[in-house]
């Protein structure tokens, strides 16, 4: 009897400390799946070895009036924001992407949806080559999307790169 009680206690205590089950992947017909697919399409278009990008596909992912906002911490820690249309981003990024490999991918994603609006917070890592062990940059992309007809379109991408004084908080890093 004591052995049985000890085994039950051991089983209960190890299951209490076991990792929680992973969340199920979104169903292909769900809004979350469509939203995450749109966000991943943005990452896929801008990522690749040095060379051309599919800018028509990139622009098709955005809603009319969409904006991309990059932030940079300057002297004294003051943040500046560079607001661009998708076309302005394309003009600024084309030369860099033609000459340099750039691979950016999300390592953690959080999606919130209400009716026809969505917010996606992705922690990203950037590499010059898909074979690079360590990223040259990490940060957070904040995507806002809107449902237009049957499609989810990007309305805003707002991002900030981490730095020594502003590391990515643990809650936005991949769960280990």
Identify what each model region corresponds to.
Residues 67-68, 80-131:
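Surface-exposed, charged secondary-structure patches
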Residues 42, 58, 66, 120, ...:
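Hydrophobic pocket/interface hotspot
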Residues 18-61, 173-176:
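Short, low-complexity N-terminal intrinsically disordered segments enriched in polar/charged residues
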Residues 10-18:
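Hydrophobic h-region of N-terminal signal peptides that target proteins for export
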Residues 1-4:
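Positively charged n-region of N-terminal signal peptides that target proteins for export
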Residues 19, 119, 138-167:
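Short beta-strand edge/turn micro-motifs at domain boundaries
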Residues 79-82, 131-134, 164-171:
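A short, polar/proline- and glycine-enriched secondary-structure boundary/capping micro-motif
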